[in-house]
Every structure is written in structure tokens, then in C-alpha cells.
């Protein structure tokens, strides 16, 4: 059974190439793996066929959103590689992502830069002569 032949001995190309559920849904994230995690995670007795597709698409969207913002943060810092600090800056500067991931600690992410108003130098109204 080598050479990509099935039980009948006919090549897979002749039968028609099998499409994964991810490719059918137009996703990059693995729908089959998400389905397996849902089944093995004891979240419910039964898992619908569209639930893993929906969850995989949500995970893919959130990942793309975070990576886009982190890429912008890396570019702002004149870096070509995204590091945990860029992820931290991207998430904490976005209101909705910060609310979603508010209790999440990112290792090596650092803290958000902030200087209290009272610590800033006072601006005088008169110009120095």
C-alpha cells in the first residue's frame, strides 16, 4: 500500500483529492484538531459538526488581529522580528483585546510605559529670555 493508493489500489488522484475541513472552510487553522480538542476536553456530550469550524475561524481571526498589531508595534520599534514585548504593546494598546486578555500575563512582555501627570515637568506660560 505505497504510492498513495487506497484499499482498492486506485490512486487518490483518480478518486478525487480529499479536501480537509479547513480547506473547505477556507481556513488555515486545523478544524479536525479543534474538533478533537472539543471532544477530548469534556465540554459537552455531543459536538456539532459546525462548532469546530466556527471556533477555528474565531481563533484564526483573533490570531491574525494580534499578529497584525504586533507587527505594527515591531515596525514602530524598527524591528523585523516580533518579540513578546511587541505582543504586550499590541494587546494593551487595543481596548477590546486588552479587555479580553486583561488577566493574561505575557512572559517577557514588560509593562506599559506611563508617567503620572504630577511627575512631568511643569510648563510655564512665559517664555525664557
From Swiss-Prot:
The record marks 122 as: Not ubiquitinated. The modification N6-acetyllysine is found at residue 5. SMART domains: H2A. The modification N5-methylglutamine is found at residue 108. One of its GO terms (molecular function) is structural constituent of chromatin. Acetylated by ESA1 to form H2AK4ac. It is found in: Nucleus; Chromosome. Gene3D superfamilies: Histone, subunit A. Belongs to the histone H2A family. Core component of nucleosome which plays a central role in DNA double strand break (DSB) repair. Nucleosomes wrap and compact DNA into chromatin, limiting DNA accessibility to the cellular machineries which require DNA as a template. Histones thereby play a central role in transcription regulation, DNA repair, DNA replication and chromosomal stability. DNA accessibility is regulated via a complex set of post-translational modifications of histones, also called histone code, and nucleosome remodeling. The nucleosome is a histone octamer containing two molecules each of H2A, H2B, H3 and H4 assembled in one H3-H4 heterotetramer and two H2A-H2B heterodimers. The octamer wraps approximately 147 bp of DNA. In contrast to vertebrates and insects, its C-terminus is not monoubiquitinated. PANTHER family: HISTONE H2A. This is Histone H2A.2. It comes from Lodderomyces elongisporus (strain ATCC 11503 / CBS 2605 / JCM 1781 / NBRC 1676 / NRRL YB-4239) (Yeast). The gene is HTA2.
Amino acid at each position: 500500500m505505497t504510492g498513495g493508493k487506497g484499499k482498492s489500489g486506485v490512486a487518490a488522484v483518480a478518486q478525487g483529492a480529499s479536501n480537509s475541513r479547513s480547506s473547505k472552510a477556507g481556513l488555515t487553522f486545523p478544524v479536525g484538531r479543534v474538533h478533537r480538542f472539543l471532544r477530548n476536553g469534556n465540554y459537552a456530550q455531543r459536538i456539532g459538526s459546525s462548532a469546530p469550524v466556527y471556533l477555528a475561524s474565531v481563533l484564526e481571526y483573533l490570531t491574525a488581529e494580534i499578529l497584525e498589531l504586533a507587527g505594527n508595534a515591531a515596525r514602530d520599534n524598527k524591528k523585523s522580528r516580533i518579540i513578546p514585548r511587541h505582543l504586550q504593546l499590541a494587546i494593551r494598546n487595543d481596548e477590546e483585546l486588552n479587555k479580553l486578555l486583561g488577566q493574561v500575563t505575557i512572559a517577557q512582555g514588560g509593562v506599559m510605559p506611563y508617567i503620572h501627570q504630577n511627575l512631568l515637568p511643569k510648563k510655564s506660560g512665559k517664555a525664557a529670555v
